[in-house]
């Protein structure tokens, strides 16, 4: 299969669609991101890399990290993990307090903010330096030793994370 041609066809079909997404402007540092950046990268099973558009552009992975941290913790906890966080879908917003209250403080799944906060707590339990462990995990998985965390984005998240603080306090209660 000609993956490069396939990616180019997808890219050309999608790039001119109306941009209906929304930048996460509630996080000041992310509000600065150019919404017109668009790239696709694919690595096939033999390690060949195919790219189109802004695929070389660095970006903040944000909630993609939830998948990666969940994989790390599932490897440590196995099915015991599901006693702390569920694995059911949710029709509510990713940062909903209502869902958490309805579920009596047990997040519905690890991909909601409340669930990812439980996963972060488990990262603290399992690793002396969880941020360093996570970064090394991502570097190894991606075969890219240049991946870095972004201090400006982290600080921006911290300064605007009031809802996440509320979620943590609700879980603790």
Question: What residues fall within each predicted segment?
Answer:
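N-terminal short leaders/motifs
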Residues: 1-2, 69
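Glycine/charged-rich beta-loop-alpha catalytic/anionic-binding loops adjacent to active sites
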Residues: 48-56, 96-103
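A short, well-structured edge-of-sheet supersecondary motif
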Residues: 15-52
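Active-site nucleophile and cofactor-binding loops and adjacent substrate-binding regions
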Residues: 56-65, 110
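A short, structure-level motif marking secondary-structure boundaries and short turns
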Residues: 28, 54-55, 152-153
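Active-site SXXK
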Residues: 47, 61-82
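Active-site-adjacent helix/loop patches that line small-molecule binding or acyl-intermediate pockets
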Residues: 2-14, 18-19, 75, 79, ...
